[in-house]
From Swiss-Prot:
PROSITE patterns: FH2 (PS51444)
Protein name: Formin-like protein 3
Gene3D superfamilies: Formin, FH2 domain
Bias-annotated ranges (Pro residues): 256-303
Lineage: Eukaryota, Viridiplantae, Streptophyta, Embryophyta, Tracheophyta
InterPro entries: FH2_Formin, FH2_Formin_sf, Formin-like_plant
């Protein structure tokens, strides 16, 4: 308020000085202009009347009154007598006696001399006598000098006043500017109603914003009634809230925290008069943060961290606490896609004006970086070895390597002592741990740093501490490599033995499978029949790749393939064989024909039996399907790895001078491993020779080693065969269902002898018999003749 008053007075003073200067300037100019104007007119008029006469100056009387020509009555231009302005004889010098200066401009002007007036010779000569004896230039009258002095003083006074006024206004402006700067940085001198529009508090149950009155007039007449603003403001500390008594409607609402950089004024006594504004503080570049005026909160319970005042926020983005001036607690970042300029028509415009509040203290305890080593009650965690801050550890090895090793140690639940004992004594450890240790072995530089470290081990991380203990053991990682070989060799040997055994069984079963050979025979004969008359006919053998092409040749119906035909023929052939086994008679076909059951039920049973036999080929050659997934190159690589690891272990055993449990365990292992490896090597060579002979048995000798390709071909053919058998089985069920209906219609013909079942299965045999009977009849007929 005082600042505004001073500004108002300064502006008023400037206006007053400007008006005064204008008035004085106009008055002085009028006087000067009046005097000069009269003199100029008089001189110009006289010169005009007497252009060739020499002027005679009269002392102090050469002052022509302006009203003679300027303010006198205008001459009449009507016809009649009037003053003559034509050139004529110069007037007598004494004629200037009547031109005395007027006493004041308000007096009536002197009359103009007329022709009827008496001659100038009759006037008193005492007035002009002195002037006739002293000719010379006229002197300026004293009245003019006096006016010049007054004008000069007036100009000096106006200029001085203007300069002083400018200096005063400049000083006032500088004082006000410095005062504003101090108020913007430091504490306030008086109360101001510059509170935020939205009032928030920690424990507020009414989440409604209080809008401060923005139309308060600071220079209104009613400012005297609001002079005691400080007396009407009370700062009450209740937990983390401040309350104001400025309006009855906002009495129950907790206010916001004070803006950053400002402190609350001290509460004045209730009956005390309004305090005078203190003098402005000296300007400071950066004043310290103001102390808290409110009383401190009650002492927190033991072990709990003191709460900060104003622990709620509605999205304050400031990095500095508005009360203490200290930086806010650093929280974990939340990565999102920030929108640059949201439109006012969007939903965010309404959300920004909401009344949502959150507990800032709880948020800092959950997502703060500094509280990671404290639990919910603020107490330190009991398991300090697992929850120590990684910033306290000394980092020696790679960060990712240390992290992976620490996770593995916790996952396997293996202590450092157990690992050290196993390395020193040759005990068994998890294979995964040993493999990870070899992969994450420190480099030569890291190992040197670990060896040279002589500080406290607790200052190292779990991974560095573990590796520090390991590098102190002689040949630690060579021991780990040998220990891994000792543990994994038995498993690798078992896998190799199983694979080699599978290959041997597959070769034997494939060569000794009667049904598989029957299939090859059927395919060979069928193919030769189809290739009659071509260069492909009369084949004696074919490669097993041909088996995979049987399903590509389709019949005239577009459904039945050559593979279907071969399978049906094999089923019929196996049905006949099943009949032979049941009759236990292998003497001749005629005996079988006479003793066989020719009923339709028996025929169907034989057909289903043949289908089961063909379907069982897949089960019979199951080892061939397992042998197809074995990689011959993988077998050779595994044997090579075993040989290399065994060589390294033997060389490492030679470098160990002192006897220890690990040295004795390694020596015994190498002795057993040599015997196992020799047997595996011999067995692998024998099995591979058997595989090659089997491939030559079916494919013939080839220039290149096909390896285990034979088993892959047979596996694919068995898959195709199994699919065709399922289709034939489904077709047989449909045929049987329709055959039952036909049997019911032929019950009347049951007395007639049914044809032989072999004729039904093999109609070609019946035709041959009919042909043979006809030939015999012809021979009998021709013989008597």
């Amino acid at each position: 308020m005082g600042r505004l008053r001073l500004a108002f007075l300064a502006i008023s003073l400037v206006v007053f000085v400007c008006v005064s200067e204008e008035i004085f300037s106009r008055g002085g100019l009028n006087l000067l202009r009046f005097s000069v104007y009269g003199e100029d007119v008089a001189e110009q008029t006289w010169i005009h009347q007497n252009p060739r006469r020499k002027l005679i100056s009269y002392p102090k009387k050469f002052s022509v009154s302006a009203p003679n020509l300027a303010f006198g009555p205008a001459p009449s231009f009507a016809p009649g007598p009037g003053p003559s302005f034509a050139p004529g004889p110069a007037p007598n010098p004494r004629s200037y006696d009547w031109l005395a200066p007027a006493s004041s401009p308000n007096e009536p002007p002197a009359e103009t001399p007329d022709e009827s007036s008496p001659s100038p010779s009759e006037e008193t000569p005492s007035v002009v006598a002195p002037s006739q004896s002293v000719p010379g230039p006229p002197r300026p009258p004293p009245q003019r000098e006096k006016k010049d002095d007054i004008l000069m003083k007036l100009i000096i006074a106006v200029a001085s006043t203007a300069v002083l006024t400018f200096v005063f206004v400049a000083l006032m402006f500088l004082c006000c500017f410095k005062r504003n700067c101090n108020n913007a940085v430091g504490s306030r001198d008086g109360p101001r109603d510059e509170g935020p529009l939205l009032r928030l508090s920690t424990g507020s149950t009414e989440n409604s914003p209080t809008v401060a009155s923005t139309s308060r007039k600071m220079f209104s007449v009613a400012s005297s009634k609001k002079r005691s603003f400080l007396s009407r403001v009370s700062l009450k500390r209740n937990g983390h809230e401040f309350s104001t008594a400025e309006s009855s409607s906002a009495a129950g609402l907790p206010p916001l925290k004070l803006p950053p950089g400002r402190s609350a004024p001290p509460p004045p006594p209730a009956a005390a008069p309004p305090p005078q504004p203190p003098p402005p503080p000296p300007p400071k570049p950066q004043p310290p943060p103001p102390p808290k005026i409110a009383r401190p909160p009650p002492a927190p319970p033991k072990g709990a961290a003191p709460k900060r005042q104003g622990n709620t926020s509605s999205g304050d983005a400031s990095d500095v606490d508005s009360e203490t001036g200290a930086p806010k607690t650093k929280l974990k970042p939340f990565f999102w896609d920030k929108m640059a300029n949201p439109d006012q028509k969007m939903v965010w415009h309404e959300i920004s004006a909401g009344s949502f509040q959150f507990n800032e203290e709880a948020m800092e305890s959950l997502f703060g970086y500094n509280d990671g080593n404290k639990n919910k009650n603020g107490q330190k965690s009991t398991d300090s070895s697992l929850r120590e801050s990684p910033l306290q550890y000394i980092q020696i090895i790679d960060t990712r390597k240390a992290q992976n090793l620490s996770i593995l140690l916790r996952a396997l639940n293996v202590t450092t002592e157990e690992v050290v004992d196993a390395i020193k004594e040759g005990n068994e450890l998890p294979v995964e741990l040993l493999q990870t240790l070899l992969k994450m072995a420190p480099t030569s530089e890291e190992e040197l740093k670990l060896r040279l470290y002589s500080g406290d081990l607790h200052l190292l991380g779990p991974a560095e501490r573990f590796l520090k203990i390991l590098v102190d053991i002689p040949f630690a990682f060579k021991r780990i490599e040998s220990l891994l070989f000792m543990i994994s060799l038995q498993e690798e040997v078992s896998g190799l033995k199983e694979a080699l055994g599978t290959l041997e069984v597959a070769c034997k079963k494939l060569r000794n499978s009667r049904l598989f050979l029957k299939l090859l025979e059927a395919v060979l004969k069928t193919g030769n029949r189809m290739n009659v008359g071509t260069f492909r006919g009369d084949a004696q053998a074919f490669k097993l790749d041909t088996l995979l092409k049987l399903s590509d040749v389709k019949g005239t119906d577009g459904k039945t393939t050559l593979l279907h035909f071969v399978v049906l023929e094999i089923i019929r052939s196996e049905g006949v064989r099943a009949l032979r086994l049941q009759s236990r008679s292998f003497s001749s076909v005629k005996t079988d024909d006479s003793n066989a059951d020719s009923s339709p039920q028996s025929v169907e049973r034989y057909r289903s039996t043949g289908l089961q036999v063909v379907t069982g080929l897949t089960t019979e050659l199951e080892d061939v399907k397992r042998a197809a997934i074995i990689d011959a190159d993988g077998l050779a690589a595994t044997l090579a790895n075993i040989s290399g690891s065994l060589t390294n272990a033997r060389e490492f055993l030679k470098t160990m001078d002192e006897e220890s449990d690990f040295e004795r365990a390694l020596a015994g292992f190498i002795e057993r491993a040599d015997a196992d490896f020799k047997w595996l090597k011999e067995e692998e060579e024998r099995i591979m020779v058997l595989v090659k002979s089997s491939a030559d048995y079916f494919h013939g000798k080839s220039a290149k080693n096909e390896g285990l390709r034979l088993f892959a071909i047979v596996r694919d053919f068995l898959i195709m065969l199994e699919k065709v058998c399922r289709e034939v089985k489904e077709t047989t069920k449909t045929t049987n269902h329709s055959g039952k209906k036909e049997s019911e219609m032929t019950t009347s013909d049951s007395n007639q002898p049914s044809p032989d079942f072999r004729q039904r299965l093999f109609p070609a045999i019946a035709e041959r018999r009919m042909d043979s009977s006809d030939d015999s009849d012809d021979e009998e007929d021709s013989s008597p003749s």
